[in-house]
Amino acid sequence: MKKLVSLLLALTMILSMAVIASAEDEPVTLKVLWWGSQTRHDTTTALCKLYEETHPNVKIEIDYAAWSDYWTKLATQVSGDTLPDVIQMDYGYLTQYAENGVLANLDEYIAAGRMDVSNAAESIIASGKWNGSVYAIPTGTNALVLMYNPALVEGYDVPTYMTYEEYIDLCKQLYADKGLTENYLAGADMNRLRFYVRNYGYELYNEDQTALGFTDAQLIADQFEYVGTSIKEGWGLNPAKSVAADTFSSITAGDTWAVLHWTNELNATETGNGVSLQMVALPAADDAVRPATFFKPSMFWSVAEKSQVKDAAVDFINFYINDLRTYEICGTDRGFPISSVVLEALTPGFSEQNQKIAAILNDMAATGNTSPIMPSDPTASAEVSDLYGDYIEKIQYGQITDYKAAAEEFMEKANELLSAGK
């Protein structure tokens, strides 16, 4: 699908200068496009009506589609020169649409304060950048965290921020005292490796996405060793139960006390499993040079480069991210507010789950425990992740014990996949 979209963009996109209409005085017709569920359609439509009421000169034409149809629809609109003014954008497609000239550069609007992102963390805004400039404004954020069951670890201190050494010491203590295991260091999720190399200033993939973003295989060997050691010593979740842990059934049953998940999964996880959970940051390398955690945009709003009403389009997005009524109508369907002021004002009215999510996101931002998000993953990343999972499984079952040799072999194969995939 991405290759088809890219071809359409390359063949049909002709750059032009937009004649910008005033968002304040002249009659404006603003076209807005998004994807999502029926609930999102209903709430966003209601928000558009509110915007029209507060901006009498603006008439909004809405358009939406399911995710499965959205990108074909958008590519068709590009080829037919019928793009909307405001486009809901996804992180995986941002580079493609920005580099093909479909999206407007928003730097001048941010500099002028017309797109007010002054209360958003720099790392959040950076997620909407391409080639050093902002082309998309995040609608909301989430982050990878360690979720744990406080009922299982009552009486033990679980700090919000831990080094690997501190985390492993806690895991060993909980296993020795209560027989509890964990499924972060023992698991097969490649985000463990991503976070580890980010701690040392690298990214998982290189800039042109033709190889891994680092050359020292010892970084991979370290992660392999964590898996092997945790299983061998018992404090890592038995691999036979790993699949169950992914759906939280094992944390509910008490087989493991901690697992890796996104913050926006808390509501469904607690409700679906009837358990109250807490969240802390993922452990960091003992000698880390930067925080590994990043705020991932739930999705974005972008402005079409060829829009004739860019001022109005920018004002609509600014209204969305900075007006409390947005979230009163739409809730946190598109993620938690990027504005710390809006988030703070809304938090008292949040559900218990949303208050916990807000607390960890706010704390990470306030304490500087995040860094800018990496570029979106290459096409071959799924194959690389599967390959990584194969190696982890063999380590979990004791079929691989020479971690350095296995790491070097994995690196070679991963680079071959990435080079071919490009």
Pin down the residues of each PLM region.
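Extracytoplasmic/periplasmic solute-binding protein
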Residues: N131-T139, L144, I168-G213, L219, ...
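Hinge/lid segment of periplasmic solute-binding proteins
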Residues: Y91-A143, I168, Y196, Q278-L282, ...
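Glycine-centered hinge/linker elements that transmit conformational signals in sensory
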Residues: C171-Q173, A211-K241
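Short, solvent-exposed loop/beta-turn-alpha elements that line the ligand-binding surface or hinge
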Residues: D107-A120, D177-G179, Y202-D222, T271-G272, ...
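Extracytoplasmic "Venus flytrap"/periplasmic binding protein-like
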Residues: L50-A120, A151-M162, F248-A258, A268, ...
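C-terminal capping/gating helix-and-loop segments adjacent to ligand/active sites or protein-protein/ligand interfaces
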Residues: K129, F295, A358-E412
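Mature extracytoplasmic/periplasmic domains
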Residues: N267, M299, V303-A382
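Extracytoplasmic/periplasmic substrate-recognition and gating elements
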Residues: K49, E53-T54, K59, Y156, ...
